[in-house]
Amino acid sequence: MTDVTIKTLAAERQTSVERLVQQFADAGIRKSADDSVSAQEKQTLIDHLNQKNSGPDKLTLQRKTRSTLNIPGTGGKSKSVQIEVRKKRTFVKRDPQEAERLAAEEQAQREAEEQARREAEESAKREAQQKAEREAAEQAKREAAEQAKREAAEKDKVSNQQDDMTKNAQAEKARREQEAAELKRKAEEEAHRKLEEEARRVAEEARRMAEENKWTDNAEPTEDSSDYHVTTSQHARQAEDESDREVEGGRGRGRNAKAARPKKGNKHAESKADREEARAAVRGGKGGKRKGSSLQQGFQKPAQAVNRDVVIGETITVGELANKMAVKGSQVIKAMMKLGAMATINQVIDQETAQLVAEEMGHKVILRRENELEEAVMSDRDTGAAAEPRAPVVTIMGHVDHGKTSLLDYIRSTKVASGEAGGITQHIGAYHVETENGMITFLDTPGHAAFTSMRARGAQATDIVVLVVAADDGVMPQTIEAIQHAKAAQVPVVVAVNKIDKPEADPDRVKNELSQYGILPEEWGGESQFVHVSAKAGTGIDELLDAILLQAEVLELKAVRKGMASGAVIESFLDKGRGPVATVLVREGTLHKGDIVLCGFEYGRVRAMRNELGQEVLEAGPSIPVEILGLSGVPAAGDEVTVVRDEKKAREVALYRQGKFREVKLARQQKSKLENMFANMTEGEVHEVNIVLKADVQGSVEAISDSLLKLSTDEVKVKIIGSGVGGITETDATLAAASNAILVGFNVRADASARKVIEAESLDLRYYSVIYNLIDEVKAAMSGMLSPELKQQIIGLAEVRDVFKSPKFGAIAGCMVTEGVVKRHNPIRVLRDNVVIYEGELESLRRFKDDVNEVRNGMECGIGVKNYNDVRTGDVIEVFEIIEIQRTIA
């Protein structure tokens, strides 16, 4: 796993560097801001924090109460309704100091509420008593005045009216009692209303204080800070308790309080929903509207979007990016569609796309380099020694059979071409030779067009290109390719005009043809040296070596000889007895036996080194090609080889490269492009030739795969189901049987178990040693899958001289055959003024009232056209036939 620094980890955890250093110190790990953190130290910190915060922070209790409620319906029938009441209560473990502070605040709040309630009640009682006393005094005055009037009137009235006066006095007394009761009720309602207003004011103040405390607590987030939702639920419960006290205090007074009291015998009287309704009725007032909801939650939507620091690696899935931004995956997909990219939630996207999406959604992006370990391993190498002159690396290029390998054989005084099938070099050979003037390293590249990638790889590793051109053949297509590769690599070219001893040799023609491609000889004012050689007779070989060494002296080639080596893989293959074998060309430093090497996706310790002659060597300096053993797998040709110090880190880098390659490959495959849409629509109509390919070396596998894939057309595609280096195994045969594929072996053979599977499944197994035959046979197989081309061929013309009527066939054209032959039941066209007016079938063909099958040129006949009666004199009837032409792959 890649180590990160304290600063990077702090940015990811969104905390300060000082706090993170303090947390590491609490866990027993001393770190500074620039120190790196390993995976084990991360785990130690996490365990420490978990132990510190051990114990459940929340305890949630749930209760369900089920009952049945009978509701009267229409027609005197009652309906039973199942009611389920769910109660949920969460207990939160608080810090002791925080709990004491909250308890003190709650106690102070309760005391303030109780004091306010008592003061309000006393004030209401005093006001009601004073008002009652004032009204009683006024009533006494009125009664005294009325009594005086009655006494004066009684003196003037007769005694028989005393009974009526007694009745009036009783009625007046009842009216006074009623007025006193009404005044008392109004006083109680006024006191109750003031009490409710005071309670609401205190509750609102408590809510405001709770909201301020919440924002104060969230201002400095820490590791053990309480959850926002927990704090909100606490204050919500406090508000509910206050409202409950309001309802309890208001019971028995007023209509609203009576309405809020539950009925006797109701099973659900004490449910939370009923209490919520009662509180809503109290808050709403008389005839008021409910403002609260029994299911209202305490969460408030943020007023503005939260901008986050999003850490993005080199690849990330859409779902992971959405989680880092705390948004839904659908929002990320919508943002990508606005940017012109379509993706699914599990699709892997690259770093650039993820950065665009995150910045488009308003977040700050932190790009994390995942190859920090690889860079650290590569930089930890002792390559500071002084540079020394080194031998040139020469690549021999040219067309097929122009004499490249023969020229190199003569230089090395060995015969390697006899081991090459058909005299054609099948894979790269690397050799170094000692001359009187110095050492030269040669790379022999194949000349066939299929080995373009191998030849390009040779040009990347070379210093000088020797372009071999046959004097009797001139410039050929592969010669032009070699020139293009040399120019692309900016490598100087030395031209070797071979086969100069042949009588038909024409070196001037070679110079003229090469001058058209920018290769000018020195005598013409150019920069390229032309040497006339003969690989058979040995003519001009010394001059060619002198020209190479002269060019190398001009280039001033130097390399560091001491220190850890680096180079490139020229070729690799899997040997049955030795395992993975790689041919390595050392560029700098010295490669020793026992060194730890990192090579692309593979790594290992060099167990053995051999030179091109098969001899064991202990070290190899710059420009020396060697075969090394001990790698974990077969590397790809062209991979960089680097000597590192630590085998464990080399393994980590190799595994990281493998995972990175898979991720990038998957991202590339899943990326949906508009230009692929129509290709996907017609995918079901394409025939496929499935091939399982095995070859002796990795370079041949690459070259053959590229050549076969280039043969694909819109109708027939070549699909490489599997490929590899080594013999054909039982697994390869099983794969070919499952996928209905052709087994192709290039310079390899099938083992005994594979042959049994091949015979049992009747598989198509083919062996090749020359790539020409392989490509030609695959072309033939693909040509057989092509649908034939249909071509119309005109076989005869007949001119209409007269038209007759027939009760059986309708209009019969009396014709004269002017060209070719007219055959019965062939398709025809009717031409009028050289314009096709009808296309159909010849139904009837007669000559002298006899049915005939054909009529030749210069003869008269009667022609009946099927389902067509508009034949006129002067028309031309064109008879043709449809022939099938077998198509081939070009």
Curated annotation (Swiss-Prot):
- From the UniProt entry, list the residue stretches annotated as the region G1: 398-405
Q: Which residues are reported to carry the modification N6-acetyllysine?
A: K808
Polar residues: compositionally biased ranges: 67-81
Sequence positions that bind GTP = 398-405, 444-448, 498-501
Annotated region (G2), positions in chain: 423-427
What's the superkingdom here? Bacteria
What UniProt keywords are attached to this protein's entry? Acetylation, Cytoplasm, GTP-binding, Initiation factor, Nucleotide-binding, Protein biosynthesis
Instruction: Show the InterPro entries listed in the entry.
Output: DNA-bd_dom_put_sf, EF-G-like_DII, EFTu-like_2, IF2_assoc_dom_bac, IF2_II, IF2_N, P-loop_NTPase, Small_GTP-bd
Provide a Gene Ontology MF annotation, just one. Answer: GTP binding
Mainly localized where? cytoplasm
Q: Where is the composition biased (Basic and acidic residues)?
A: 92-217, 267-280
Region G5: start-end pairs: 534-536
Q: A Gene Ontology CC term for this entry?
A: cytosol
Q: Where is the composition biased (Basic residues)?
A: 252-266
Region (G4) residue spans: 498-501
Q: Where is this region: Disordered?
A: 45-304
Q: Where in the cell is it found?
A: Cytoplasm
Tell me where in this chain the tr-type G domain is found: 389-558
Residue ranges of the region described as G3: 444-447
What does this gene product do? One of the essential components for the initiation of protein synthesis. Protects formylmethionyl-tRNA from spontaneous hydrolysis and promotes its binding to the 30S ribosomal subunits. Also involved in the hydrolysis of GTP during the formation of the 70S ribosomal complex.
Which HAMAP family is this protein grouped with? IF_2_B
Q: Which family does it belong to?
A: Belongs to the TRAFAC class translation factor GTPase superfamily. Classic translation factor GTPase family. IF-2 subfamily.
Can you name this protein? Translation initiation factor IF-2
The organism of origin for this protein? Shigella sonnei (strain Ss046)
